[in-house]
Amino acid sequence: MEKRTTIYDIAARLGVSTATVNRALTGKPRVKEETRRLVLQTAEEMGFRPNSLARSLARRRLRFAAVGFTSFPEFHNDFLRGVKDAGAELADFNISVDCLGFDRGPSDTPEAEAFLDGTLRDIADGGYDGVLVLGRMVDAFRYLAEKKVCAATVVNDIEDRSLRRFTICSRGRIAGRMAAELIYRMLPDRGRSVAIASGYEGMPAHRETELGFLEQTERTPLDIAEVAYNHDNAEIAYASTARILREHADLGGVYVNSFNYTGVIRAVRESGRAGEVLIIASDICEELKELIREGTVVASIFQNQYEQGRLGLHRMYEALADDAPVEDVICIDPQIVMYSNITLY
């Protein structure tokens, strides 16, 4: 069966937003006449049948939710911002979007898990059609499936993939390889040991970066002192890093494969070895930018959770509104952020 052309295909062909294509096709303002002409010409060439907009007005409003659940609001708020921007881009297509974020401290407590489970159950009972979840596996995913709410995971996947429609994530295996090679190339004495400050043992997002790091050490050999699981808790990360520094006087580098960098930095600074121990972090924020500028962190592997959120809502809309096929796993390429290119982020 031939794939029907959508406004997403036209937008991709022309390198413009779906909102621009929509305004051009519907005769709305705020579109240059040359752009409107080009959109209409391309739509005709691609065999576009302008029925998607009409269907969106005829059907009931589609309701979407997004949940950001980590110990670090600064991290998951970027994901939610991407979802909100996608909602604005789809504003003419009869949808609504509600964004919910966790801001009650560490996410590794029973109270935090109850928040995530309860929030997803409320969404299942709240008449929503789809939900994007940046979090981890809880029983409520089964309840969402029972209620026939389309669920998708972002940044981190869940173990039972039958409970979600698709996942969007960074290429974690590659991110881990990049981190290992960076440390190998930058380490003055390659005989010194390195550690991985990870999140949860077995959690897909953390497991993939760990595996990538370890795989790369087969090509660029590094002595792994320890993989520490810090449960996305800054205090646990501080304690484990301080212990590793005491036990491994030769420690030359640390790869932090989650946003949980503050405890690691504090321990390294208190040991008097800031700038001596190479630190590769993950993602980016204003504080991390400053740490890179001052040399405490040499680089960070950025997974662009904003774009994961924005793309996630678009893909979910396509799946529910247009019954379009969606890849099971949608990957975002990781990027290296260093002093030399930090102004781009």
Language model region names:
Residues 201, 217, 304-345:
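Hinge/cleft segment of the Venus flytrap/periplasmic-binding protein
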Residues 87-116, 193-196, 214-235:
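Short beta-strand elements in bilobed, periplasmic/extracellular small-molecule ligand-binding domains
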Residues 75-91, 175-179, 204-222, 240, ...:
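Short, solvent-exposed amphipathic alpha-helices that sit
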Residues 136-174, 285-293:
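Flexible loop/hinge segments that line or gate small-molecule binding clefts
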Residues 49-114:
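Amphipathic helical "hinge" segments at domain boundaries
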Residues 166-193, 237-238, 288, 304-321:
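Hydrophobic alpha-helical segments within soluble ligand-binding/sensing domains
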Residues 1-60:
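N-terminal helix-turn-helix DNA-binding module of bacterial transcription factors
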Residues 115-119, 123, 129-146, 213, ...:
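Hydrophobic alpha-helical
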